[in-house]
Amino acid sequence: MAFQGTSRTLTQQSSAATSDELQKILFSPEAIKKMAAECDLGRHHWMRADNAISVRPLVPEVTHGRIASFFKSGYDAGELCSKGCVSVPQVLCAVTRTVSTDAEGSLRIYLPDLGDKELSPIDKQCVTLHNHHLPALVSFQPTYDCPMETVGNRKRCFAVVIERHGYIGYTGTTASVCSNWQARFSSKNNNYTHIAAGKTLVLPFNRLAEQTKPSAVARLLKSQLNNMGSSQYVLTDSKINQNARSESEELNVESPPAAIGSSVASRFESFRPQVVNGL
């Protein structure tokens, strides 16, 4: 199924004409497909043994080149104050496991600058998640705006890097990571307060709690249990013929239901099946 989402990229320009031109670059059908295919924006990325390290730039390479050319032409013409920067206030990753909690493994997720050849985490924007701790939410906050430039053969921007460690014997998908962010392009750049990478462990979803009403089968079982509990007969104080010693003789004893609240009824009431889990 083709990706049908929309890019969350925003622009910060004072000129309506330049803003419209930049909007066409960012929100064209091709640009939207690139955001999905190259960046996995809003999509689930599966971590497999044959894909143990994943590097996803926050801006597609083709889109990066077109935006950089747009800002450069405006800068050379004296219309813009810089060659352009990309600002990402926050990156949010939702991580879920796809194997048993007994599997020994972990994920290392961090935010580097592609201008750094070593791809080191910027400002300690790095977290490690063990398999038995999942699901979890991870957040990153860059402390600066990244210049739209080319370093060597790399288009400089931020990226999300995911490393899979351990999971011996598991060659398939062990975790799913869904990343979302909002990239802004501007001719101005700034620095921001340092905020450490966040890691929030999330309770697994309780599917049974969503079933607020008993099912048809549960209602049927409940009615049957109630009927069984009400079909009780006890001996009354009627006199029995003491001379009837033959085992073949039948004792005809009336058995009306016990009065509510009587000690005899309470004894039988204690043997009624208990109803649990809403049955």
Swiss-Prot record:
GO annotation (BP), single:
transport of virus in host, cell to cell
Give UniProt keywords alphabetically: Host cell junction, Transport, Viral movement protein
Q: Which GO terms describe its cellular component?
A: host cell plasmodesma
- Report the domain of life of the source organism: Viruses
| Coiled coil residues, start to end | none
Q: Where in the cell is it found?
A: Host cell junction, Host plasmodesma
Task: Give the main location.
Answer: host cell
Q: Which family is it part of?
A: Belongs to the cucumovirus movement protein family.
Q: What does this protein do?
A: Transports viral genome to neighboring plant cells directly through plasmosdesmata, without any budding. The movement protein allows efficient cell to cell propagation, by bypassing the host cell wall barrier. Acts by forming a tubular structure at the host plasmodesmata, enlarging it enough to allow free passage of virion capsids.
User: Which protein are we looking at?
Assistant: Movement protein
